[in-house]
């Protein structure tokens, strides 16, 4: 009949939020790996009460991240103490996040400006 049928398949990247949520979930479930002296890269299960094998989709890490809330000069981290936060911001500059749950002081300022007012 002369007609031809063509099928095309392709993969589509999921929405960015879906990828971010999956990475966040895996981040919080990541496994600390302590290499043996033999440097085989195998898991050291001595600190884990129940042994579990990591899956191919699991995230693993070799050392804990520094605490960026506290000052650590050897890492050139000044910490967050003394920084200005935004009480109403939903972002990373909000007071709860930036002050690491330590509380914060509220500074109220009334700006004064010179004007050519006559009384």
Curated annotation (Swiss-Prot):
InterPro entries attached to this UniProt entry: Wnt, Wnt_C
Post-translational changes noted in the entry: Palmitoleoylation is required for efficient binding to frizzled receptors. Depalmitoleoylation leads to Wnt signaling pathway inhibition.
Gene Ontology annotations of biological process type: canonical Wnt signaling pathway; cell fate commitment; neuron differentiation
GO MF entries: cytokine activity; frizzled binding
Residues bearing attached sugar chains per UniProt: 86
Lipid linkage positions (O-palmitoleoyl serine): 1
Alphabetical UniProt keywords: Developmental protein, Disulfide bond, Extracellular matrix, Glycoprotein, Lipoprotein, Secreted, Wnt signaling pathway
Alphabetized Pfam families for the sequence: wnt
GO cellular component: extracellular space
Disulfide topology: 85-100
Location within or outside the cell: Secreted, Extracellular space, Extracellular matrix; Secreted
Gene3D superfamilies: 3.30.2460.20
Signal peptide interval: none
Main subcellular localisation: secreted
Stated family: Belongs to the Wnt family.
Described purpose of this protein according to its UniProt entry: Ligand for members of the frizzled family of seven transmembrane receptors. Required for normal tooth development. Regulates the expression of genes involved in tooth development.
Protein name per the record: Protein Wnt-10a
Biological source species: Plethodon jordani
Source species taxonomy: Eukaryota, Metazoa, Chordata, Craniata, Vertebrata
């Amino acid at each position: 009949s002369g007609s031809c049928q063509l099928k095309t398949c392709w993969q589509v990247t999921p929405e960015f939020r879906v990828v971010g949520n999956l990475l966040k979930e895996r981040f919080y479930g990541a496994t600390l790996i302590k290499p043996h002296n033999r440097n085989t890269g195998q898991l050291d299960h001595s600190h884990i009460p129940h042994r579990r094998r990591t899956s191919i989709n699991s995230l693993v890490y070799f050392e804990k991240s520094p605490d960026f809330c506290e000052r650590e000069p050897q890492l050139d981290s000044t910490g967050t103490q003394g920084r200005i936060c935004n009480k109403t911001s939903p972002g990373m500059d909000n007071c709860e996040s930036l002050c690491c749950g330590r509380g914060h002081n509220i500074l109220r300022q009334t700006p004064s400006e010179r004007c050519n007012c006559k009384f």
